[in-house]
Amino acid sequence: MKFLYIVILSLLSLQFFAQEKPDYGKIGVRIADESSDYYYPKLFGRYIAADRSLTVNDFRYLYYGFTFQAAYVPYADSEYRGNLAVFFDKKEINEEDLQQMIKYGNLILKTLPFDLRALQLLDYAYYHSGNRKKSDDAEFKRKMIIKAILSTGTGLSKNSGLHVIDDLHKFDLLAEKKLRYNGVQRIANNSCEFMGVFENDKNIRGMYFNIGRLYQVSAERLKGQ
């Protein structure tokens, strides 16, 4: 079954539409419209249920639409992330460890529903504890979030930066592309950051990430909007 979903996700990538920057104004209007297919409570319910009929476009509305929700806090992190650190240093993971990973992974997702690291962890923990359905659900969500982000640009120039709503997602996307961050980070323009990477076979010196939405929401919250 796990192999089947990997095949399905690969086929989805063949239907990938042209890269397009998120239109936050349009997203905000549609997710607030109760008659829209993108009405956020309804769409988010489908996400929680890991509805396989959700498309990359649906995930664009889910991911970027989250920034319009009161639950979204720019630059927030989970208090439970530290509880998982111990497991990354263990040579062997037992059943009790798996259950703890599941517990804390789900706690992270309660406040950060698009946390790629928690989803990857749950994919692993559920798979090795024998719950293939929940493992596949976590993998589906993570892969589709990544596809949604990659649909926003190439990441190879400041005018085509990948739009992220979570600062950690810059590092997650580098890892997804098998690029290692080299510690170089600089502002490219008023909404884009450059992240340098070590020498690689792709001849990529670094990637650009558009974090303008984090800035915007932070500013709006400070003004009390």
PLM regions and their residue ranges:
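N-terminal alpha-helical interaction modules that lie
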Residues: 19-98, 159-225
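TPR repeat positional signature
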Residues: 80, 119-122
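Alpha-helical solenoid repeat scaffolds, predominantly canonical TPR units
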Residues: 97, 104-105, 138-141
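Boundary/linker segments of alpha-helical solenoid repeat arrays
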Residues: 116-117, 144-158
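TPR/TPR-like (Sel1-like) alpha-helical repeat modules
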Residues: 127-150
